[in-house]
Design a protein with these regions (language model features):
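Conserved Nudix-box catalytic region and its N-terminal flanking loop in Nudix hydrolases
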Residues: 35-76
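Hydrophobic packing within well-folded, soluble alpha/beta domains
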Residues: 66-75, 87, 105, 122
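Conserved N-terminal beta-strand and adjoining loop/helix that marks the start
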Residues: 9, 14-39
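Active-site-adjacent beta-strand/loop module that shapes the phosphate/pyrophosphate-binding cleft
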Residues: 81, 90-113, 123
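Short secondary-structure junctions
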Residues: 77-84
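NUDIX/MutT-family hydrolases
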Residues: 106, 115-146
Length: 148
């Protein structure tokens, strides 16, 4: 994919890898307060971004809809079946090595216990706690949408 980038007022054509992913914004009512919502976050345990936090999800496979990909990824990563709700937003983010398109969906748990099969750690965060972890840059872009 060819992307046009504007830098210092000049147009530069740059070949950049494009990765399209889906992210689950799994939410529930707080266990301590039935009036407050919590959002599930996971911590990476590998690679360049080890120890950074993200919303669970992953890459879409050929022929999958975003909803199908999200259900598959959460089952693979967390052994949990989810209901995929509305599309909250799509984040476009330029990492140094690639451009990321991340489709973010509100989700709820149908069954399963959110077992960490690929992640280092996980936390349920209230809206006030969202800034208490170090988010991957693209995921950090999503935080403003969750504070409303």
């Amino acid at each position: 994919m060819t992307l046009w980038m504007i830098s210092n007022g000049q147009h530069n054509m740059e070949q950049r890898k494009h990765i399209e992913v889906v992210a689950a914004i799994i939410h529930r009512l707080s266990q301590s307060s039935s009036k407050e919502e919590e959002i599930f976050a996971t911590q990476r345990g590998y690679g360049e971004w080890k120890d950074w936090w993200e919303f669970p999800g992953g890459k879409m496979e050929s022929g999958e809809t975003p909803e199908e990909a999200l259900k598959r990824e959460i089952l693979e990563e967390l052994a949990t079946e989810i209901e995929v709700g509305k599309l909250l937003t799509t984040v476009e983010y330029d990492y140094p090595q690639f451009h990321l398109t991340m489709h973010c969906y509100l989700c709820t748990i149908i069954s399963g216990g959110l077992s960490l099969l690929e992640h280092e750690a996980a936390r349920w965060l209230t809206k006030d706690e969202l800034n208490s972890v170090k988010w991957l840059p693209a995921d950090a872009e999503l935080i403003s949408h969750l504070r409303v």
